[in-house]
């Protein structure tokens, strides 16, 4: 294990801000692609059950109508994507984009308790996530945690600016008092959300409906197709379920043992590399009614969120490699100027 840690430490993995840039870029991709499909009729129809049962978005239909609600969301998502992209250079824009991203994924995650047929009845209901609804939404837990991570990073960098604007000084101080700057908050949220995702998706693989839902993905996966010849229809799903639960346990153990966390993060990286490489090969991945690429159809829209989950896996891997090298695990990374916010000391 020591050799693995040293090997990873010598790799580009520990490049400063690599994880930050990957998470930011992944969220930009998500907002651009999902925003794009909101302009088409097929996506407006797909959104109906989500908006209708969303406690934070149900008002969109009375205000804008079916197509108007979809267009409104498209504008918002593109705006958030642009702000996050500008955040590579301008932390103020990045902070605003992160706030918009948090609101977006709070809106989607809160749909889950109210969505009809959110849990598969053939598998006994909860915690068997329905393949066509909850499975799509549950990944947003990780996207929400990633948004909190970016908000914290941008707030800390803004707080260290030489001349922050007064308005944003107040905003950053408010965020500091809210507990956003708590040590390892973002790290814990990202790790916890990944554990939840692996648990739920691993659970579905042990049931018939989950095995059937996997057929197009495994059949067209360049890194997964061998599972059917090796294990058969149900065996392939069970193999993946066991692997996903094993990954979840390693990631969960990473809260206390960074070396186990490294193994979990590596398994997570392998998982999402395997799923993302399906995208170029899966049939009907792009909506023909909207002209094809970049208008995502159901299977690609489901897989595309794994861009963020892969970036988060790399973040966790980097964090655990750093912690495995340092005896004082989880040393405070917060600048002094951020630590003084709660005391009300004026900075800048």
Residue spans of the language-model regions?
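Membrane-interface extramembranous regions
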Residues: 1-348
């Amino acid at each position: 294990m020591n050799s693995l840690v040293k090997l990873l430490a010598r790799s580009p993995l520990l490049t400063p801000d690599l994880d930050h840039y990957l998470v930011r870029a992944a969220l930009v991709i998500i907002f651009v692609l999902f925003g794009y499909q909101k302009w088409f009729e097929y996506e407006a129809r797909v959104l109906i059950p989500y908006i209708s049962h969303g406690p934070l978005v149900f008002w969109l239909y009375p205000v804008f109508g079916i197509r108007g609600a979809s267009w409104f969301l498209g504008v918002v998502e593109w705006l958030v994507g642009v702000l996050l992209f500008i955040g590579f250079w301008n932390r103020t824009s990045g902070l605003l984009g992160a706030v918009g991203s948090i609101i977006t994924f709070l809106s989607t995650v809160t749909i889950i308790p109210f969505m009809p047929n959110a849990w598969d009845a053939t598998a006994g209901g909860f915690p068997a996530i329905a393949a066509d609804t909850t499975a799509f939404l549950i990944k947003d837990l990780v996207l929400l945690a990633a948004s909190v991570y970016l908000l914290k990073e941008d707030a800390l960098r803004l707080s260290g600016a030489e001349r922050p604007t007064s308005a944003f000084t107040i905003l950053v101080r408010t965020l500091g008092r809210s507990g956003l700057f708590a040590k390892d908050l973002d790290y814990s949220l990202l790790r916890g959300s990944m554990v939840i995702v692996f648990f739920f998706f691993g659970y579905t693989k042990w049931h018939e409906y989950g095995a059937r839902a996997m057929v197009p993905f495994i059949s067209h996966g360049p890194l997964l197709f061998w599972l059917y010849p090796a294990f058969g229809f149900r065996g392939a799903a069970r193999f993946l379920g066991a692997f996903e639960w094993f990954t979840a346990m390693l990631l969960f153990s990473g809260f206390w043992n960074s070396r186990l966390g490294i193994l979990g993060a590596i398994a997570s990286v392998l998982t999402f590399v395997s799923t993302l490489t399906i995208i170029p090969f899966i049939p009907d991945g792009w909506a023909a009614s909207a002209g094809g690429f970049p208008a995502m159809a159901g299977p690609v829209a489901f897989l595309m969120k794994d861009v963020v989950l892969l970036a988060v896996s790399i973040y966790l891997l980097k964090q655990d490699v750093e912690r495995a090298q340092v005896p004082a695990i989880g040393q405070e990374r917060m600048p002094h100027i951020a630590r003084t916010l709660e005391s009300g000391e004026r900075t800048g």
